[in-house]
Amino acid sequence: MARFFRRRKFCRFTAEDVQEIDYKDVVTLKNYITEAGKIVPSRITGTRAKYQRQLARAIKRSRYLALLPYTDKHL
């Protein structure tokens, strides 16, 4: 039986030496929200706690400014 090997999680922001996550960088922020619009937890993405807090703050700010949607569909 074949063994399944998981990809090692790492923090992209630490690897790229990012100081502050920008709320205007919508392309990056879209990678950290689900199709339903929820913020993906750090246990799935591998993001460090410091950057996860910055990420959540940036996503919430960009939602408030209508750069990102709150949900996938508005009925």
UniProtKB/Swiss-Prot annotation:
Function field: Binds as a heterodimer with protein bS6 to the central domain of the 16S rRNA, where it helps stabilize the platform of the 30S subunit.
Keywords (A to Z) from UniProt: Ribonucleoprotein, Ribosomal protein, RNA-binding, rRNA-binding
GO molecular function: small ribosomal subunit rRNA binding; structural constituent of ribosome
Gene3D superfamilies: Ribosomal protein S18 (4.10.640.10)
Protein family: Belongs to the bacterial ribosomal protein bS18 family.
UniProt-listed GO biological process terms: translation
Descriptive protein name: Small ribosomal subunit protein bS18
Classification via Pfam families: Ribosomal_S18
Self-association state and partner proteins as the record states: Part of the 30S ribosomal subunit. Forms a tight heterodimer with protein bS6.
PANTHER family according to UniProt: 30S RIBOSOMAL PROTEIN S18, SMALL RIBOSOMAL SUBUNIT PROTEIN BS18M
InterPro entries tied to this protein: Ribosomal_bS18, Ribosomal_bS18_CS, Ribosomal_bS18_sf
